[in-house]
Each structure stands twice: as structure tokens, then as C-alpha cells.
Amino acid sequence: MSVLAIITYDVKPGRIEDFLTKLKQAADPQFHSPVMPKSVRLYRNTVPGPDTGPVLLLIEYADMAAYGARTAFENGNPTWQALFAAHPNAPETLVSVQLLTEF
């Protein structure tokens, strides 16, 4: 069964390009693992405007085992951890993580 991780971020005003740059860095081959997501998609509000509200990152995995393997890779990679570490100057703030399974 497919697993969908929905990661919600608040992006600071005027910092969306910085956040997109960070996501592009996350796609670098140094972060490729034996198990990779099936798809990665980024959404934002359309109404009342694109710079209002949260940004949603949707990452789809083949199953819970694939999600677990990828999560273990990310948690064990110090460079990945540094890239997404919370700090005051980061363009984004993590709001929530939801993990959904298809049925």
C-alpha cells in the first residue's frame, strides 16, 4: 500500500526562493539512497494568493518499508540533518508531518 508523507511548512515572507533552493539541494545525488520516493510534489495556496498560508510537501513511498528505509537514511546522514536543522535564519518553519496510508 502506498504511503504519503505530508510535510507542512510556514515559509517566511520573501523567502520562498531560499526554501526552493534548499529543496533543490535535497535532490542532490549525495542524498540518493537505495530506496527513494515514488514522487515528490510541492503545493501552495492559490486563493487568496500564492504567498499566503503554508506550503505542503507531499512525498509518496511504495509502502511503509520504503518510508522507513528512507527515514533511516535521512536520520543517519549528518549532512541531511544539517540541511534541515531548525535555526532562526532558516527560510521555513516545520509546522507538521502527517503520514497517510492508502487503503
What role is predicted for each listed range?
Residues D10-L23:
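Short, surface-exposed ligand-recognition loops at beta-strand->loop->(often short) alpha-helix junctions
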Residues R44-T46, T101:
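Short, low-complexity Ser/Thr-rich regulatory SLiMs
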Residues S2-D10, L56:
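Active-site-flanking beta-strand signature of metal-NTP-handling nucleotidyl enzymes
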Residues A69, E102-F103:
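A beta-strand edge to alpha-helix "cap/lid" segment located at domain peripheries
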Residues K24-V40, P48-D51, E60-V97:
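An amphipathic, aromatic/His-enriched active-site/gating alpha helix that lines ligand/cofactor pockets
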Residues K12-G14, A62-M64, E102:
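Short coil/turn motifs at secondary-structure junctions
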